[in-house]
């Protein structure tokens, strides 16, 4: 259900794309694919939108114990080397059951759920809200907002065709639904579009843009002040 994420996860949602969440983009993509596949995704879309009679299926997609969380905790634990996120997801899945159309856990699986909650909290402390992660995200948001501001003033900026589309056009919720170019360009974006732009922007005459871009490349990032 995260196919609507852009480069660097949530960064684009409030910078070069306004007023549309990655969940909404995911749904637009699914509905488009559903048309191309002659309705074969209709059931999946119903579950995604929580419109399917068996409501517990939506909890597997989006809930406090959904498959997304079980997936990203293990994956991020592996790639960051932070072992606390390496939980026993197979055990949790095995302990799942359904009662009154809701997901429940067998009593002998409570310990596994406690481990899951602890793992998620520790991963937020050590990875997702780590000062370096937060600083990089804030700098990238500031960089893209500055690039968007310059683009709105007609300043020429290097960008891939897909990134240029979003920098030089005001894209909102309605545009994504009614302008097919939005979706076409969005699915072409990946992390490489951003990194390549940052390298070129690091020598741009605009000091704000070049300083932010160079800081990202050289890891000269903002400091986090805790008060």
Label each region the model flagged.
Residues 3, 7-227:
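Histidine-centered, transition-metal-coordinating active-site segments
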């Amino acid at each position: 259900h995260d196919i609507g994420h852009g480069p660097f996860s949530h960064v684009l949602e409030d910078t070069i794309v306004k007023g549309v969440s990655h969940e909404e983009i995911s749904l637009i993509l699914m509905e488009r694919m559903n048309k191309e596949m002659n309705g074969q995704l209709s059931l999946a879309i119903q579950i995604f939108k929580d419109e399917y009679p068996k409501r517990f299926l939506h909890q597997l997609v989006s809930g406090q114990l959904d498959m997304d969380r079980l997936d990203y905790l293990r994956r991020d634990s592996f790639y960051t080397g932070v072992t606390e996120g390496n939980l026993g997801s197979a055990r949790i899945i095995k302990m799942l059951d359904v009662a009154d159309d809701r997901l429940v856990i067998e009593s002998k699986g409570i310990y596994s759920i406690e481990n899951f909650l602890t793992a998620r909290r520790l991963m937020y402390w050590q990875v997702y809200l780590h000062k370096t992660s937060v600083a990089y995200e804030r700098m990238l948001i500031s960089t893209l907002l500055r690039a968007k501001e310059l683009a709105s003033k007609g300043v020429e900026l290097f960008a891939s065709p897909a990134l240029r589309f979003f920098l030089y056009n005001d894209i909102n919720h309605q545009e994504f639904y009614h302008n097919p170019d939005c979706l076409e360009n969005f699915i072409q974006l990946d992390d490489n579009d951003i990194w390549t732009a940052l390298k070129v922007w690091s020598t741009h005459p605009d000091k704000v843009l070049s300083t932010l871009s160079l800081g990202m490349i050289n890891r000269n990032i903002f400091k986090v002040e805790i008060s």
